[in-house]
């Protein structure tokens, strides 16, 4: 399957989830990309079976950000392959990737890949930096390479749900 259209859906108050989601989306190399920024308002998506989607949200306290899930509640897929990405502040992402995968699966998407990337912690300061400057250029290059791996998986017919607990 070669998706013609990708949906890049993210909640990104500090911009870290957006940067990684866009990099993964570039790696998918779809002819058309639709960006759905749920940072300030709820979004509605009606993805089709032949599309692909990237969902990226920050981790708060080991969980997918609750406000992100509320803002993404109206997304719908039709067996649409999805990449789930969580951004964590260099502490732990715990159950966030599983929660996001379950969330999108309940809305008609098939989680075919998952990743956790480090993003600058929201508590980071000049005096007490926590993952300062992340994701950086290397992180975004890795995210784009990850998107290319997913593109190859989809081209080979890989639209089976993965077990995100193994991440």
At which residue positions do the language-model features occur?
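FMN-binding flavodoxin-like domain, especially the glycine-rich phosphate-binding loop
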Residues: 1-8, 12-20, 25-39, 43-167
């Amino acid at each position: 399957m070669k998706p013609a259209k990708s949906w890049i859906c993210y909640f990104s108050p500090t911009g870290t989830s957006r940067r990684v989601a866009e990099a993964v989306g570039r790696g998918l190399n779809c002819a058309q990309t639709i960006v759905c920024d749920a940072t300030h308002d709820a979004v509605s998506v009606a993805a089709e079976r032949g599309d692909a989607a990237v969902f990226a949200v920050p981790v708060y306290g080991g969980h997918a950000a609750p406000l992100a899930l509320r803002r993404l509640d109206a997304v719908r897929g039709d067996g649409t392959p999805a990449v789930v990405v969580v951004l964590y502040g260099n502490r732990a992402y715990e159950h966030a990737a599983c929660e996001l995968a379950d969330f999108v699966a309940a809305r008609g998407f098939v989680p075919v890949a998952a990743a956790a990337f480090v993003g600058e912690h929201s508590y980071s300061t000049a005096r007490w930096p926590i993952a300062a400057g992340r994701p950086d250029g290397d992180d975004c290059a890795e995210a784009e390479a990850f998107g290319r791996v997913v593109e190859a998986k989809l081209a080979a017919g890989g639209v089976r749900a993965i077990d995100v607990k193994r991440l």
